[in-house]
Amino acid sequence: MGKPSILVVEDNPLSRATAVDMFKNLGFTVLDAYNGHHALALLEARPEISLMFVDVRMPGISGLELAKVAHKRRPNIKIILTSGYVGEDVVPSGVNFVPKPWRMEQVAQAVCGSKL
């Protein structure tokens, strides 16, 4: 079996590149999207995606909206939400949250908590 595939969804190019590198270092095959619409297109086209790492605050479709749509389309997909502006209190129960700035230990713990 190949490496697990993750979809990083982040509108900030620098943050997106940082997250991509971080997940590659954790052994993932990484795809990235610059907004929610792009993420949904990739999710539809790439059935191997098993985990999403999603910024909560994005223009257009927010991370919370994206998580809801993704779960409707792919009920078994695991989602980790992230933000530097909101706290865990806005994150739905059962969804992992990692605050920005990211620490590798927190991200690794959230991934393990996602039960891939």
Name each model feature, range by range.
Residues 32-41, 63:
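Helix N-cap/capping motif at the beta->alpha junctions
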Residues 58:
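Receiver (REC) domain active-site loop signature in two-component systems and cognate sites
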Residues 55:
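Active-site residues of response regulator receiver
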Residues 102-115:
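C-terminal output helix
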Residues 17-25:
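Charged docking surfaces used in two-component/phosphorelay signaling
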Residues 10:
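Conserved acidic carboxylate
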Residues 41, 64-76:
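Short amphipathic alpha-helix used as the core "switch/output" element in two-component signaling
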